[in-house]
Amino acid sequence: MHSPGAAAYVFLQCLVALVAAVIAQSGADQPPTTVVEVTAHGSVSMTPPTPRSPLLNETELVELNQPGSTAVFVALPTNPPTVSVDSSSTTTVASTQEPTSTTERTMSPEEIQKLLLPPATVEADILHVNATDDNRPDAKSSGKDSECPTLEGADHLSQTQLLTRLTHVCRYDRLERPKRESINGTNGPVKVYARAYIYFMQNLEAHDLQFKIHALLQFRYVDPRLVFREVAPNRTKPIMGEQSLRDLLWVPHVFLANERSSDILGTAEKDILTSISPDGTVIVSTRISATLYCWMNLQKFPFDEQHCSTVLESWMYNEDDLVLLWEHKSPVTLAPELHLTEYVLLEMFTNETVINADLSDLRHGAFAGNYSSLSFTVHLAREMGFYMMDYFIPSIMLVAISWVTFWLQADQSAPRITLGTSTMLTFITLASAQGKTLPKVSYIKASEIWFLGCTGFIFGSLVEFAFVNTIWRRKRNVEVKKVNSKHVLKQAITPRPARKDMSGLHKSHSCTSLADSATTVSANSFNNYLTVHSIPQKSPSSATLPIISTTDVDRAMTEASNVTIQIEGQTSNVNGNGWTTMTPQEVAIWIDKRSRFVFPIAFVIFNIFYWTFVYYV
């Protein structure tokens, strides 16, 4: 198997033979000088013979096996060539005289291929090579029109022609920022003025801490290299273009520091507008859609106010090379039809600052320094209409419904339990629906304070029912010193035996409620009394056992019928010591009646404190 190098060598040998034959055939009419040298390692020396070629009577030495091959031009007299072929690894076709001059220049592989073309195409190929050399980035300006096009007669040039000459590599480098002379003569920073127009702003998404805008960002700066006022005095309109024009110019790289995602708007093409004024002022306008982070404070949710900023920063150049400034007139403008459904815009303000970046935080890649920054902030307040109708008013109604149990009798357990538990579950469901739209934060929010307050009142009504139901089922009367909240609740929680002083005898009553004999029960629902008289001992020598006597049921009922309890305007059974006897049912009813007023008044007081905190603290 032959190696690729051997195959290439055979091909070059055939090519040399073909060229030698062509030279020999045309030697009678024209004495060209062509040198073609092929070595084993792939070296070729050749001069294409053509009358129109500027390379006539020159030898071009090309090293094919090295990048950026070198061509050597050797001027030779126009003597007939001699051809010598031997069995060595080198074939040479050359004239018999030594070269008189030698010049060198670098040729690309494309030029080498063109040298191997037939003679008829050499002139066109050489023109192509010259044009390629003029447009190379590393080409040096020599002052010739072919290398650096002139700006004379710019008034008669088209916009594309003028732009092509202004941005030619001989006079413009798009990788280099514009130079601006400062007061002391040094190269000062480029001043870039910014302006923003907000088309659309989406409501803040609290659970993602972000908002979305559609805006037009415009940057204005002066590039002295693009001034054409002197060369084209009659051209007063700016040069306009889109993305293609922007790609030819130096443009400041400004990024959104709090960006989550962004994109340039546009359908068929991106919405980028670039203009160059005669005085060199460049304006670049871009329509963007951006999703930005907004770090919200939800402590007063849903009565919160948020400050959301859009931050612009210079990416590549620090403040020594580039300074960002807001336009003095209307730096940020909102579209008249812009309307937010959940928020109301209170104010908007702009700011110019400097951001310090060091190598530790990598804020600007591997660069450290002070970078210019711009920001505009919107102050938004949340609208309360939705939350009032969807959360606060329904929760107030649920709390009020829980108070209906105070008008039901204490022994009606089923309706009171059903009403209390259903109210509690409904309110928890209502509150959980609101919490799903919020992020999970560690601090307490205003909505959670409201939730805890309403839950406390609903739970309090359930506790009140359990309390009065327990008292209702007691079978022992309660004696209170005074019929007020302090004494009634104290005796209801920790009941004591009834006290009655009977002229030296301590008399106590106990009753047994017989539910089965409801038809014979007295007005106070007591049908059996046992009276125990205790005779105090006069001295230690007296009888050691007390005398106990019982009365029959009729006498007990007769005596009990003479006892009355003071309940809302009725006379109470007050003994000589000022104690009042109340039945358990009367205590339960008394607590329910007081709860009908205490709970609403307490809820009103809670609302006063809550709404004062929300709006004034």
Curated annotation (Swiss-Prot):
Extracellular compartment residues: 29-387, 435-447
Keyword Lyase: no
Annotated Low complexity bias: 82-96
Record keyword Transmembrane helix present: yes
Residues bearing glycans: N57, N130, N184, N234, N351, N370
Region (Disordered): 82-110, 131-155
Reaction it catalyzes: chloride(in) = chloride(out)
Compositionally skewed regions (Basic and acidic residues) per UniProt: 131-147
Pfam families found in the cross-reference section: Neur_chan_LBD, Neur_chan_memb
Membrane-crossing segments per the record: 388-408, 415-434, 448-468, 597-617
Cellular component terms (Gene Ontology): plasma membrane
Phenotype upon gene inactivation: Adults are infertile.
Record family assignment: Belongs to the ligand-gated ion channel (TC 1.A.9) family.
Entries under PANTHER family matching the protein: NEUROTRANSMITTER GATED ION CHANNEL (PTHR18945)
Protein name: pH-sensitive chloride channel 2
Species name: Anopheles gambiae (African malaria mosquito)
Gene this protein is translated from: pHCl-2
